[in-house]
Amino acid sequence: MNIIEQLEAEQAAKIAAKRTLPDFSAGDTVRVNVRVVEGSRTRVQAYEGVCIARSGGGLNESFTVRKISYGEGVERVFPVYSPLVESVEVVRRGKVRRAKLYYLRDRRGKSARIVENTGTRARKLNEAERQAVAEEKARIEAEKVAAAQALAAEKAAAEAAEKAAAEAKAAEAAAE
C-alpha cells in the first residue's frame, strides 16, 4: 500500500469512527442530514430524495441525490466523507437495474417512479440498519447521561469548596 492509500485509509477510519453510513445504492430513497452554516448559527437540514448515482472511490467517493422541489428537479452531490454530512438514513430501498439513474432527469410523474425492493437482502439490510440506529441512539443517550452526571458532580464539588471557603473565612473573622 502506498503512502496516499495509507493516508486515505486512516482518514476514512477516523471519519467512520465518528459516524457510519448505511449501505445504500442507486435507486434508494435517502434522507441526508446536512450541517448548514448561516452566519454564526449552524443547523441540520434534511435533504430527502432518490440516490441516482454513486461515484468515485476512497475519500473522493460521492453520491448524487435528486428530489422534486416545487415542481422543479433539484440534484445535489454529497461527498461520502464530508464533515458537513451528519448522517444518512435509507427511507426506502429501490429496485433498479442500472448503477446510474440519469434517465430520471427526463421523466416526470409516474414514469419516474422506482419500484420498492422487498427482497430478503433489502429486509436484512433494513433490520440491521434499524438495529444500528437504535444502538447509536442508546450510545449517545448514555454519553449524555454520563456527561450530565459528571457536570452535576463537578457543580457539587465546586459548591462544597465554595462553602468550605466561606466557613473558613467566617472562622477567620470570628478569630479576629
Swiss-Prot record:
UniProt KW keywords: Ribonucleoprotein, Ribosomal protein
Gene Ontology MF annotations: structural constituent of ribosome
Superkingdom of this protein's organism: Bacteria
Pfam families attached to this UniProt entry: Ribosomal_L19 (PF01245)
SUPFAM superfamilies linked to this entry: Translation proteins SH3-like domain (SSF50104)
InterPro entries: Ribosomal_bL19, Ribosomal_bL19_CS, Ribosomal_bL19_sf, Translation_prot_SH3-like_sf
One GO CC term, this protein: cytosolic large ribosomal subunit
Any GO BP: translation
Entry's family note: Belongs to the bacterial ribosomal protein bL19 family.
Biological role: This protein is located at the 30S-50S ribosomal subunit interface and may play a role in the structure and function of the aminoacyl-tRNA binding site.
Record-linked HAMAP family: Ribosomal_bL19
Protein name per Swiss-Prot or TrEMBL: Large ribosomal subunit protein bL19
Gene name in the database record: rplS
